[in-house]
């Protein structure tokens, strides 16, 4: 892949990706948002501890073997019921990457942020993280670097550094 950036912690890999089929499937299955809640052998972070305005649609999420286990410390990956509905994003990602592990969509409302955080747990120690922007415009920040991201952009970021985002657009990103 060609990198469009000269930063160390954020690499814009592709711009101008046609995401129309991915977006169409998101629009076709609006009830998939949040559908991962309550799955057996899966863990959702405590909403009282991890307060966010982000809506989540997990396609493949982390799993656990026993109650109370930290999902960040397991290699278990569980396809959710929504997985079968979102073939276009899986097709695109499969063309770009040889192995897709945990995968989901995040919807961030206008003017909202995801504060700086580091992905916690042993799962993330040897995993790379990527974002494929589906709609809107946002600023992605990693350490002291930032980039403005538009729909149709694929980027890699260093999830071992503090990272976060702010929605700059006039629609949910």
What does each model-found stretch correspond to?
Residues 128-133, 154-157, 170-173:
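A short hydrophobic beta-strand segment most commonly corresponding to one strand
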């Amino acid at each position: 892949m060609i990198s469009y950036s000269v930063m160390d912690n954020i690499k814009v890999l592709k711009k101008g990706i046609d995401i129309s089929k991915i977006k169409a499937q998101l629009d076709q299955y609006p009830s998939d948002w949040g559908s991962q809640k309550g799955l057996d052998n899966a863990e959702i972070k405590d909403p009282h501890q991890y307060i966010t305005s982000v809506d989540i649609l997990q396609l493949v999420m982390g799993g656990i073997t026993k109650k109370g286990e930290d999902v960040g410390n397991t290699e278990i990956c569980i396809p959710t019921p929504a997985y079968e509905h979102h073939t276009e994003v899986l097709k695109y990602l499969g063309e770009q990457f040889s192995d897709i592990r945990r995968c989901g969509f995040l919807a961030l409302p206008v003017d909202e942020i995801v504060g700086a955080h580091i992905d916690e747990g042993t799962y993330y120690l040897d995993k790379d993280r990527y974002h494929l922007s589906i709609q809107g415009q946002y600023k992605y920040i990693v350490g002291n670097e930032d980039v403005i991201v538009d729909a149709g952009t694929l980027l890699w970021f260093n999830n071992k550094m503090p990272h976060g985002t702010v929605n700059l657009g006039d629609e949910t990103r």
